[in-house]
């Protein structure tokens, strides 16, 4: 079977880092792109100075579907030359998102293997937004 050029980016071309490496990179100024749903993000996310939540998949009455505006939303907030870490709950969605970003020309993007669950397992700092008031 032949493969089209548009789908030529393979997972092997995507760089993955573990959560310990990710924590160090975040401390050195990398941006964190959390691709989980907004509800997952609000329940808890890694502590990072520069963090953005853009879901890769959306919950619908029919189940989860890919966010068709994902690349457009990312490009409105992040530059292809930025140092970006991409994470999700376990590493599956972020791997797909990272693969798509690499194919779209993002040069310094890395997948966070293990995702938020691994971050929590390592007892790294987290933030939650469930109980916080929206204004002072």
Curated annotation (Swiss-Prot):
Its EC number is 2.8.1.1. It is found in: Cytoplasm. It catalyses: thiosulfate + hydrogen cyanide = thiocyanate + sulfite + 2 H(+). InterPro entries: Rhodanese-like_dom, Rhodanese-like_dom_sf, STR17/STR18/HARC1-like. One of its GO terms (cellular component) is cytoplasm. GO terms for molecular function: thiosulfate-cyanide sulfurtransferase activity. Its main location: cytoplasm. Residues 26-128 form the Rhodanese domain. It comes from the Eukaryota. Keywords: Cytoplasm, Transferase. Pfam families: Rhodanese. The active site is at 88 (cysteine persulfide intermediate). The keyword Cytoplasm applies. It is an enzyme of class 2 (transferase). Catalyzes the transfer of a sulfur ion from a donor to cyanide or to other thiol compounds. Substrate preference is thiosulfate > 3-mercaptopyruvate. This is Thiosulfate sulfurtransferase 18. It comes from Arabidopsis thaliana (Mouse-ear cress).
């Amino acid at each position: 079977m032949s493969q089209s050029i548009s789908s030529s980016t393979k997972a092997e071309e995507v760089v993955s880092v573990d959560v310990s490496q990710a924590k160090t990179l975040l401390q050195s100024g990398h941006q964190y792109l959390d691709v989980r749903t907004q509800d997952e993000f609000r329940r808890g996310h890694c502590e990072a100075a520069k963090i953005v939540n853009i879901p890769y998949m959306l919950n619908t009455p029919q189940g989860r579907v890919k966010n068709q505006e994902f690349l457009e939303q990312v490009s409105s907030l992040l530059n292809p030359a930025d140092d970006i870490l991409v994470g999700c709950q376990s590493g599956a969605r972020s791997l797909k998102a990272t693969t798509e970003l690499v194919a779209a020309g993002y040069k310094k993007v890395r997948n966070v293997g293990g995702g938020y669950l691994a971050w929590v397992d390592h007892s790294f700092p987290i933030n939650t937004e469930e109980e916080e008031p929206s204004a002072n």
